[in-house]
Swiss-Prot record:
Disulfide bridge map: 238-429
Coiled-coil segments on the chain, per record: 174-225
Oligomer status and interactors: Homomultimer; disulfide-linked. Interacts with NDUFA13. Interacts with cell surface lectins (locutions ricinus communis agglutinin I, concanavalin A and wheat germ agglutinin) and cadherin.
Annotated ranges, domain Olfactomedin-like: 237-499
Source organism of this protein record: Mus musculus
UniProt-annotated glycosylation sites, renumbered to this chain: 64, 128
Gene: Olfm4
Protein name, per record: Olfactomedin-4
Pfam families: OLF
PANTHER family: OLFACTOMEDIN-4, OLFACTOMEDIN-RELATED
One annotated GO biological process: immune response
Function of the molecule: May promote proliferation of pancreatic cancer cells by favoring the transition from the S to G2/M phase. In myeloid leukemic cell lines, inhibits cell growth and induces cell differentiation and apoptosis. May play a role in the inhibition of EIF4EBP1 phosphorylation/deactivation. Facilitates cell adhesion, most probably through interaction with cell surface lectins and cadherin.
Keyword Coiled coil applies: yes
Record's subcellular location: Secreted, Extracellular space; Mitochondrion
Domain remarks in the Swiss-Prot or TrEMBL record: The olfactomedin-like domain is involved in the interaction with cadherin.
Length: 505
């Protein structure tokens, strides 16, 4: 626009000069004789003009343009423009290039967003792998060869993704480089774990598989004259040599009152006349871990699993988790005392309430880690039992066989095992089995007392548990299972017996 303005100003100046010169010349011709020489003509130039050269033209410079009038009075103007005109075509190309670059930037930016999301996803997977590897480091027995293969496969997938990101990503790759280093470290760690295998778990398992194969071959080729392995004892029978092992726990259900009710007991009612009866009872204590106020009955295990078809009852006099059911009766330690109460499961009425002679109560000699269980009631194939301690026994376990109808004591045995050092106990075929805590995940059946022979001794049967504390253990003679109340969860264990009956001494 500035060049156009300059051109117009120059043109106006030239036209103005020419018109004034013409008027002046005409006026001079009217008043005087026209000059015959260039010198005379020069006298009539406009004010501010320069002298005209003889026989030629005189230029009048103004800014960056010049104007002149020749000898005939004709105005001539010249305007000095830049060497090149305004580059409109180059500006248009620049705008087009900028548009193309903007589109490319948008595409690359969208890729960056996708990469960021992918990095976030794989970062979470990497954290998950880290946790799994840490678990494998802490508990080497829990992992398998398949675990290694799955982890290595996932790490390889992440390595491929990182390489793809580095190939396609333009700009700073600092985050991707860090992720690649972490994945490389994870790969080395998994390979190190697999190669070290500190407990030789994988090699041992391979050897076990090989041994099992050989064992099957031996069994297939052995003579038919070899007598078969004797079957397990019949339900409710004592034709065996005692407990020699125990299965892994089966989690049946959380107690019906919820996770906060960590203390209590549960089991299956046993009746020698009707051993197949499937009446299950659950008796969680109140949150004070002392008072037994409510219990629930289920007619089958299926109903217990889905909390269906149950009967709820309320009592106000139970104490501790030493409860047991026998012959359609519930036996409990009476609240704040040394009595035992017999409650009819059909009517919820107390039929008998009788003191257990000399029994300590109210946490005098309770189990380790469990309060208010000074008196623990138990059932086996033979009778109803009371497991407790007295001042006369100096806290050692006392076993009494009870009349399940009158609650009178029939026989009593005093052991050498201190009751507060025991975490819990149960009876099988007249033999007391006591447990102790090894750690937060393991109990041990470490002690037994046989009332049939009055012999006692040590055992080493490990017993896994789901939670830290075991509150009660009840044995059922017909299904030969332990019913364990473990921090609010209802667990089942199968007992394994020695096939050869124990010889009396």
């Amino acid at each position: 626009m500035s060049y156009s303005l300059l051109f117009l100003l120059a043109l106006q100046f030239c036209l103005g000069s020419a018109s004034r010169t013409t008027l002046t010349s005409a006026h001079s011709r009217e008043l005087t004789t026209p000059p015959t020489s260039p010198q005379a003509t020069a006298a009539w130039l406009p004010p501010g003009g320069t002298s005209w050269a003889e026989g030629g033209t005189v230029s009048q410079p103004l800014s960056n343009f010049t104007g002149s009038v020749d000898s005939h009075g004709t105005c001539q103007c010249s305007v000095s423009l830049p060497d090149t005109a305004f580059p409109a075509d180059r500006v248009e190309r620049l705008e087009y290039t900028a548009h193309i670059l903007s589109q490319k930037f948008e595409r690359e930016f969208s890729k960056v967003k996708e990469y960021v999301q992918l990095i976030s996803v794989y970062e979470k997977r990497l954290l998950n792998l880290t946790v799994r590897v840490e678990v494998m480091e802490k508990d080497s027995i829990s992992y398998t060869e398949l675990d290694f293969e799955l982890i290595k496969l996932e790490v390889k997938e992440m390595q491929k993704l990182v390489l793809q990101l580095k190939k396609n990503f333009v700009g700073s790759t600092h985050i991707i480089d860090m992720l690649e280093v972490e994945i490389r470290n994870m790969t080395l760690l998994v390979e190190k774990l697999e190669s070290l295998d500190q407990n030789n778990v994988l090699s041992i398992r391979r050897q076990i598989l090989a041994l099992k194969t050989k064992l099957k071959e031996c069994e297939a080729s052995k003579s038919d004259l070899v007598p078969a392995t004797p079957p397990p004892p019949a339900p409710g029978s004592c034709s065996h040599g005692g407990v020699v092992n125990i299965s892994a726990p089966s989690v049946i259900q959380l107690n019906w009152l919820g996770f906060s009710y960590k203390y209590g007991a549960w089991g299956r009612d046993y009746s020698p006349q009707h051993p197949e009866r499937t009446l299950y009872w659950v008796a969680p204590l109140n949150t004070d871990a002392r008072a037994l106020e409510y219990y629930r009955l289920y007619d089958s295990l299926d109903n217990l699993l889905i909390y269906s078809h149950f009967r709820d009852y309320r009592i106000r006099y139970g104490q501790g988790g030493g409860t047991v059911a026998f012959n359609n009766n519930l036996y409990v330690n009476w609240y704040n005392g040394g009595n035992i109460a017999k409650i009819n499961l059909t009517t919820n009425v107390v039929d008998v309430n009788r003191p257990l002679p000399l029994a300590a109560y109210n946490n005098r000699f309770s189990y380790a880690n469990v309060n208010w269980q000074d008196i623990d009631l138990a059932v086996d194939e033979q009778a109803l039992w009371a497991i407790y301690a007295t001042e006369a026994s100096t806290g050692n376990i006392v076993i009494s066989k009870l009349n399940d109808t009158t609650l009178e004591v029939i026989s009593t045995w005093v052991t050498k095992q201190y009751k507060p050092s025991v975490s819990n106990a149960f009876m099988v075929c007249g033999v007391l089995y006591a447990t102790r805590t090894l750690n937060t995940k393991t109990e041990e059946i470490f002690y037994y007392y046989d009332t049939n022979t009055e012999r006692e001794g040590n055992l080493g049967i490990t017993m896994r548990k789901m939670q830290e504390r075991i509150q009660s253990i009840n044995y059922h003679p017909f299904d030969q299972k332990l019913y364990v109340y473990n921090d609010g969860y209802l667990l089942n264990y199968d007992l394994v017996f020695l096939q050869t009956p124990r010889q009396p001494v």
